Amino acid sequence: MAVQEIWLVRHGESVANVAAARAEAAGEDLIDVPYRDADVPLSPLGEEQSRALGQELADRRIDDVPVTLWVSPYLRAQQTIEIALAAGGLTEPAKRVDERLRDRELGVLDLHTLQGVRNRHPDEERRRQWLGKFYHRPAGGESWADVMLRLRSALADVDRLEGTERLVVAAHDAVVMMVVAVCLDLDEPALMEFARTNAVANASLTRLRREHAGAPWVLEEFSSVEHLDDEEVTEHTGRKDDEHVR
């Protein structure tokens, strides 16, 4: 038995997402978040989004085949899947918390708005413009290529999973995007074009499928939020080079 499906869940809206949107709208340089990135919790809306996600997972019968759960160590991702499983009345499957699934590290640019990056770190902004989003690594942080490298390592473990047909990954928008890029073998231009026209919404569901071990992965669904009919849909992503948002 081999993993045939990967279901990717982005965490619900976080309090840092809310603070970042507020800081951007106010034209501020810095985002006021009293947590380190790993400890950022969900917002009240994020909790509601997670409950709606849980009902969707139950409706889709996520546990109708053997399931394994991989989770980012960051609080917002863990809260999302815990709330979702409880809301859907689902039993927690075999779980692994894996640091390779953490969000992208922004280094000196963390908690800066886009304006703040330009005002306080103009050299980093010039480097980003020159290198491009895929290769730019802010001081003390990671490039998209760095995130992709650690996710290649994690995905190499997929074929070593025993007794599992469906892998559920609860993590972050950068992780969802990079897992899709690795599975579909997207190069830099293809990934940048895909990211330009597609955003990973909060509490969204993305699905990849293959026929058997070694077969190519197919993207069956990307950032589905149909289950958020009664909740606000939020993106809070780096789609417009707004790289600060958690």
Question: In which residue ranges do the predicted regions lie?
Answer:
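Short, active-site-adjacent cap segments at secondary-structure transitions
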Residues: V15, R76-Q78, D103-R104, V175-M177
